Swiss-Prot record:
Pfam families: polyprenyl_synt. This is Geranylgeranyl pyrophosphate synthase 7, chloroplastic. It comes from Arabidopsis thaliana. Isopentenyl diphosphate binds at residues 95, 98, 127, 146. GO terms for cellular component: chloroplast. Its EC number is 2.5.1.-, 2.5.1.1, 2.5.1.29, 2.5.1.10. Catalyzes the trans-addition of the three molecules of IPP onto DMAPP to form geranylgeranyl pyrophosphate. Keywords: Carotenoid biosynthesis, Chloroplast, Isoprene biosynthesis, Magnesium, Metal-binding, Plastid, Transferase, Transit peptide. Belongs to the FPP/GGPP synthase family. One of its GO terms (molecular function) is geranylgeranyl diphosphate synthase activity.
C-alpha cells in the first residue's frame, strides 16, 4: 500500500472564525453572460451586498486594466518565439480572478488600483506559468486551456517549459521594479509570493497531486485532498489577496483577516472546480471536462459525493463572508461579490 507522508510540509488549515493574440479588451457581453448567476446571488446575499453594486462592470473594468498592464509588461520582442509563447497564454481570455482579488483587497484597505496593478500582474504571470506547466504531458497532459490549444500543443514542450520559467522571472522583476510603495512593503510582498509558489506552496501541492493519482481512496483521505488543494490552488489566491493588502498599506490585523478569507475562497475555488469537472462539458468549461475522473485523480465528489461537496462549498462561502465582517461596508462589496462568483461560477 502506498502512503503519503505530509509531515514534511507545514499544516495549513481552513479557519472557520499559434496565432498570437493581440491585446483585446473584454467586452461587456462576454462577462455578462458568465456573471448573470452571480449578480442574482449578490442581490440577495443576506443584505450584505446591496443590489446597486454592479459587479459585472467592476469585473470588466478591473480585468481590462489588468490586461492592458500585462500587454505592456510583456511586449513582443526578441527572441520572438519565446515571447510569442508567453503572450499566447498570458493574454488569453481568462476571468482574471486572482489579479482582481489583489486590486479589491488593496482598495479595501485604502489603496489605489494603480498601486496594486504590478502585484496583480505578477500574480497572473505566476498563475499562467502554473497553467502552462500543469498542462504538460509530464503533468496533466491536457490539450485545451481557456478554450484554446494548450501552450505546448502550439509551441512544443521545450518552448512551453521555458515560457513558464520566464514568467516566474517576469513576475518577480515586475513586482520588484514597478510597485510604487515603500521598499519594506515590496520586500514583504516578494516574500509572500515566493513562499506561495515554492516547495512549501504550489510545488508541494502539485507533487502530492501527482503521487496520489490512481491510489485507492481508502488509502487517501480528505486530509490529503485538502493539502493538495490548499497548496496547489488556494495558496495563489491567498497570495493575490495578501499582496493587495500589503501594498495597499493594510494593518497586520487586516492582512491576516484577508488571508483567512482568501484561504476559504481558495479552497472553495477548487471544490467548485471539482464539481464542474463532472457536471459540465468541455465546451462549457473551455478546458477538457472529466479529465480528473479519467486520470483517476482525487476530487471532492470522488471522496465525498456530489451533494456533500456542494454542502462543503456552501460552508466555505459562509466562512469567507465571516472574515470580512468589520470592514467598510461599501469597499468590501467587491470581495463579497467575488466570493459569490467563485461559488456560483459555471466554468
Amino acid at each position: 500500500m502506498t502512503t503519503l507522508n505530509l509531515s514534511i510540509f507545514p499544516s495549513v488549515k481552513i479557519s472557520s472564525s499559434a496565432s498570437i493574440p493581440g491585446f483585446i479588451k473584454i467586452q461587456p457581453f462576454l462577462l455578462r453572460r458568465k456573471l448573470s448567476t452571480v449578480l442574482s446571488v449578490t442581490a440577495r446575499d443576506e443584505g450584505i451586498i446591496h443590489n446597486h453594486f454592479d459587479f459585472t462592470s467592476y469585473m470588466i473594468g478591473k480585468a481590462n486594466a489588468v490586461n492592458e498592464a500585462l500587454d505592456s509588461a510583456v511586449s513582443l520582442r526578441e527572441p520572438i518565439k519565446i515571447h510569442e509563447a508567453i503572450r499566447y497564454s498570458l493574454l488569453a481570455r481568462g476571468k482574471r480572478v486572482r489579479p482582481v482579488l489583489c486590486i479589491a483587497a488593496c482598495e479595501l484597505v485604502g489603496g489605489e488600483e494603480s498601486v496594486a496593478l504590478p502585484a496583480a500582474c505578477a500574480v497572473e504571470m505566476i498563475h499562467t506559468m502554473s497553467l502552462i506547466h500543469d498542462d504538460l504531458p509530464c503533468m496533466d497532459n491536457d490539450d485545451l486551456r481557456r478554450g484554446k490549444p494548450t501552450n505546448h500543443k502550439v509551441f512544443g514542450e521545450d518552448v512551453a517549459v521555458l515560457a513558464g520559467d520566464a514568467l516566474i522571472s517576469f513576475a518577480f522583476e515586475h513586482l520588484a521594479t514597478s510597485t510604487a510603495v515603500s521598499p519594506a512593503r515590496v520586500v514583504r510582498a516578494i516574500g509572500e509570493l515566493a513562499k506561495a509558489i515554492g516547495s512549501k506552496g504550489l510545488v508541494a501541492g502539485q507533487v502530492v497531486d501527482l503521487t496520489s493519482g490512481g491510489m485507492d481512496q481508502n488509502d487517501v483521505g480528505l486530509e490529503v485532498l485538502e493539502f493538495i488543494h490548499v497548496h496547489k490552488t488556494a495558496v495563489l489566491l491567498e497570495a493575490a489577496t495578501v499582496l493587495g493588502a500589503i501594498v495597499g498599506g493594510g494593518s497586520d490585523e487586516e492582512v491576516e483577516k484577508l488571508r483567512r478569507f482568501a484561504r476559504c475562497i481558495g479552497l472553495l475555488f477548487q471544490v467548485v472546480d471539482d464539481i464542474l469537472d463532472v457536471t459540465k462539458s468541455s465546451e462549457e468549461l473551455g478546458k477538457t471536462a472529466g479529465k480528473d475522473l479519467i486520470a483517476d485523480k482525487l476530487t471532492y465528489p470522488k471522496l465525498m459525493g456530489l451533494e456533500k461537496s456542494k454542502d462543503f462549498a456552501d460552508k466555505l462561502l459562509s466562512d469567507a463572508h465571516e472574515q470580512l465582517h468589520g470592514f467598510d461596508s461599501s469597499r468590501v462589496k467587491p470581495l463579497l461579490a467575488l466570493a459569490n462568483y467563485i461559488a456560483k461560477r459555471q466554468n
